[in-house]
């Protein structure tokens, strides 16, 4: 059996992720499509306040966000990283986007992974590409 390389944690939230095995398989599929492999990827689900403090401490940003991705990779094509996701933001964004919490969470899971494969989202063009990649990633789900 393959050793797990994708881990899920929580900080300052009671959120329980469902379908972990299916999500791991799906995330590995996304990475492979981008010609990457995952050495170690940690997803940490947290509250708005927890992620706001991280945003202040590490990025010097004083606003809420749904995700912060830290790239710890040392070798090109081999993903190592920590992705912090605010469950509060995901729930709010799902309502704003007229989406389900599950779909919005999956979009954000893919978004963080795509950052680790080199995609950015600062410019309008980058945001459009990121959204297209997120949509393509969501279409790969088999669950």
UniProtKB/Swiss-Prot annotation:
Signal peptide: none annotated. Its cofactor is Zn(2+). GO terms for molecular function: metalloendopeptidase activity; RNA endonuclease activity; zinc ion binding. It is found in: Cytoplasm. InterPro entries: MetalPrtase_cat_dom_sf_prd, YbeY. Binds 1 zinc ion. The keyword rRNA processing applies. Pfam families: YbeY. GO terms for cellular component: cytoplasm. Keywords: Cytoplasm, Endonuclease, Hydrolase, Metal-binding, Nuclease, Ribosome biogenesis, rRNA processing, Zinc. Belongs to the endoribonuclease YbeY family. Single strand-specific metallo-endoribonuclease involved in late-stage 70S ribosome quality control and in maturation of the 3' terminus of the 16S rRNA. This is Endoribonuclease YbeY. It comes from Cytophaga hutchinsonii (strain ATCC 33406 / DSM 1761 / CIP 103989 / NBRC 15051 / NCIMB 9469 / D465). The gene is ybeY.
């Amino acid at each position: 059996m393959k050793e797990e390389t994708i881990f899920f944690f929580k900080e300052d939230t009671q959120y329980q992720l469902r379908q972990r095995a299916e999500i791991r398989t799906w995330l590995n599929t996304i990475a492979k499509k981008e010609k990457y492999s995952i050495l170690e990827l940690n997803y940490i689900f947290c509250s708005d306040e927890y992620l706001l403090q991280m945003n202040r401490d590490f990025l010097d940003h004083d606003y809420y966000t749904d995700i912060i991705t830290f790239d710890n990779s040392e070798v090109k094509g081999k993903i190592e990283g920590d992705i912090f996701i605010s469950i509060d933001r995901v729930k709010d964004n799902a309502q704003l986007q007229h989406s389900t919490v599950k779909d919005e969470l999956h979009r954000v899971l893919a978004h963080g992974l795509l950052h680790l494969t080199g995609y950015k989202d600062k410019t309008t063009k980058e945001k459009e590409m990121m959204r297209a990649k997120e949509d393509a990633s969501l279409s790969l789900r088999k669950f």
